[in-house]
Amino acid sequence: MAQAHRTPQPRAAPSQPRVFKLVLLGSGSVGKSSLALRYVKNDFKSILPTVGCAFFTKVVDVGATSLKLEIWDTAGQEKYHSVCHLYFRGANAALLVYDITRKDSFLKAQQWLKDLEEELHPGEVLVMLVGNKTDLSQEREVTFQEGKEFADSQKLLFMETSAKLNHQVSEVFNTVAQELLQRSDEEGQALRGDAAVALNKGPARQAKCCAH
């Protein structure tokens, strides 16, 4: 008896990851490149001078949703400062990185925040302040409390890390990823709500007028 042939069913195409752009800002030698390299490749190099901008990508899963983080690592040297502003455009999040052993880098991170605010609309970009090099805490010039108080005053996320020891590096990027997804979902719900209200109202009726 001939067996019935089953019609092959097309497989559902895997959903594409949702893409978010993340920029790393801060003075030279604070460890921006080291943080990105540690997170993306679990590698560490103490000296990674960036010329202009370096680019990394990583796909992460937040619950059932895949996110693709496009990580733009900007150069911290003053001569590249104006060029780095070009990478602000379209950014969803920014990490303001400073070296906890250098007070000047902490003050410079505050200037980077002002630059961001001048380029982008308030609330347009999610910002986290990151104090790097906790492995050198005996040489600390910026206390945890100083960083936390400034972050709180500006409504920023805040965390301290060590790219060298791989301390809280994944936590920094994963926290940002979770916040970005939550923001995106909330904005999507708000837009759908506005659209539903507009549909319920329907087109405005024009009043008829009679000519006498």
Swiss-Prot record:
Task: Kindly list the places in or outside the cell where this protein is found, as annotated in its UniProt entry.
Answer: Recycling endosome membrane; Melanosome; Cell projection, Dendrite
Attached lipid, kind S-geranylgeranyl cysteine, located at: C209, C210
Q: Which organism is it from?
A: Homo sapiens (Human)
SUPFAM superfamilies on file: P-loop containing nucleoside triphosphate hydrolases (SSF52540)
Protein name (Swiss-Prot/TrEMBL): Ras-related protein Rab-17
Pfam families linked to this entry? Ras
Q: Which GO terms describe its cellular component?
A: apical plasma membrane; basolateral plasma membrane; dendrite; dendrite cytoplasm; early endosome; endocytic vesicle; endomembrane system; extracellular exosome
Q: What is its EC number?
A: 3.6.5.2
Q: Where does GTP bind?
A: G31, K32, S33, T50, G76, N132, K133, D135, A163
Q: What gene does the UniProt entry assign to this protein? A: RAB17
Q: Which residues carry this modification: Phosphoserine?
A: S29
- Species classification: Eukaryota, Metazoa, Chordata, Craniata, Vertebrata
- Main subcellular localisation: membrane
| UniProt topology in membrane | Lipid-anchor
